Amino acid sequence: MAEKQKAVAKQEKVAISKRDPWALKKWFSVYAPSYLGGVFLAEVPANEAQKLLMRTLEVSLYDITKDISHLPIKLKFQIHRVEGLKALTRFKGLELTRDYIRSLVRKGTSKVTAITEVKTKDGMVMRIAVLGITTHRIGTAQKSAMRKKMIETLVKKAAELDSGQFLKEILEGTLAADLFIVAKKIAPMRKVEIAKIKVLKYPPEEEQIVVKEAVAEVTSA
């Protein structure tokens, strides 16, 4: 009898979904990581929580801070945990808009780009691109020296902090300010920005949480 009731209920759900695909969807509230205050990011629909796992959401840093100067900073977050109708995220990447980068590069200045991989204290691996703009043109030797110093600073800073602390310093502008100080010892600077970040590997503890979530959802299905 119980099996028959389940079969009937399943048929009813299928019939409803065919008439209106949105009828069975739930709305989940998505939140930023705790080091960003766990602020609300958006609401997303899904038939079940499992389908939300690993979904990527893109927002502007302005959406979190309400600081107009943060509009050009695009962030990517990945849903890695679901608690009821609450979806929790982890940082996935950052990128400055092309229009903003073009606005920084002016005639008579030099652009210095430093790209490196860093590893945080808790094991997160990221590829980071830093963009430095000088007040006037500089030579190849100065560019190389500046690039080397910025990379050394990035690697050292990452190794001293866990991923949450490191990302917080990036998003608050603290790391860019530190890099500006390092760079201006070599040449006068107009601007230093973290231009792009891509997460290559998450901390082991964080990966374990994702695996547990996925297993729990499959088991309960």
Swiss-Prot record:
NCBIfam families assigned: PRK04057.1 (NF003142)
InterPro entries: Ribosomal_eS1 (IPR001593), Ribosomal_eS1_arc (IPR030838)
Cross-referenced Pfam families: Ribosomal_S3Ae
GO cellular component: cytosol; ribonucleoprotein complex; ribosome
Organism: Pyrobaculum aerophilum (strain ATCC 51768 / DSM 7523 / JCM 9630 / CIP 104966 / NBRC 100827 / IM2)
Assigned keywords, A-Z: Ribonucleoprotein, Ribosomal protein
Molecular-function annotations in GO: structural constituent of ribosome
Secretion signal, residue range per the UniProt entry: none
Family: Belongs to the eukaryotic ribosomal protein eS1 family.
Keyword Protein transport: no
Gene name of this polypeptide: rps3ae
Protein name: Small ribosomal subunit protein eS1
GO BP terms in the entry: translation
Protein's UniProt keywords contain Ribonucleoprotein: yes
